[in-house]
């Protein structure tokens, strides 16, 4: 009987040791904390983001991406008929530009349309009057827009209306891309990212 009791005690001790070991292993292998919401690695999944492009600005002039070099820039892809996400993002970009200007940091806000059929230079110019005066609006033909959206890994697709419907809508990814003074991609931020997050990132770099 005594031997049976000792065996039970040994089994209990071994079970406890196994449990503690399993818990330690679980904790040591847990997923590390995520970065601040909205921030991603410079190259996510080893995919290059960004690159050179040439489009047409809101004044009808040819605009080359080299013109952005020398300053930080924020680039957003959207369309002027977008009912909510785009104006919200552009308002946030306006706020970011104003905050950075107070800290003596120059940054250029850029809006590239994914709807070149409707967003002509004239339409862009009128639309951007509602946002920061530094905004650069860019359009082009469908091939040019496809080229630049491919480089920035932007998703967009028509979601309603037939080919003759002028009131069609577009579904699209909503990222704000931060580009350095050499024209290289640094980060992209999500719609819910705050200006403070971008400021903190810039201070750390």
UniProtKB/Swiss-Prot annotation:
Transmembrane segments: none annotated. Keywords: Copper, Metal-binding. One of its GO terms (molecular function) is metal ion binding. The keyword Iron does not apply. Cu cation binds at residues 82, 86, 172. Signal peptide: none annotated. It holds the Pfam family SCO1-SenC. Belongs to the SCO1/2 family. This is SCO2-like protein RF_0960. It comes from Rickettsia felis (strain ATCC VR-1525 / URRWXCal2) (Rickettsia azadi). The lineage of its organism: Bacteria, Pseudomonadati, Pseudomonadota, Alphaproteobacteria, Rickettsiales.
């Amino acid at each position: 009987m005594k031997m049976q009791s000792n065996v039970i005690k040994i089994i209990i001790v071994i079970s406890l040791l196994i449990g503690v070991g399993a818990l330690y292993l679980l904790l040591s292998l847990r997923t590390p904390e995520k970065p601040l919401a909205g921030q991603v690695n410079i190259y996510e999944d080893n995919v290059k983001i960004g690159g050179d492009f040439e489009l047409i600005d809101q004044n009808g002039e040819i605009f080359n991406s080299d013109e952005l070099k020398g300053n930080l820039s924020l680039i957003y892809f959207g369309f002027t008929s977008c009912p909510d996400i785009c104006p919200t993002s552009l308002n946030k970009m306006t706020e970011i530009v104003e905050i950075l200007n107070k800290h003596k940091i120059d940054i250029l806000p850029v809006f590239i349309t994914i709807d070149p059929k409707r967003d002509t230079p004239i339409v862009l110019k009128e639309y951007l009057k509602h946002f920061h005066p530094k905004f650069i609006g860019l359009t082009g033909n469908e091939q040019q827009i496809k080229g630049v959206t491919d480089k920035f890994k932007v998703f967009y697709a028509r979601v309603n209306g037939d080919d003759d419907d002028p009131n069609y809508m577009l579904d699209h990814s909503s990222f704000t891309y931060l580009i350095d003074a050499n024209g290289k991609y640094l980060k992209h931020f999500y719609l819910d990212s705050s200006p403070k997050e971008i400021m903190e990132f810039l201070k750390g770099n």
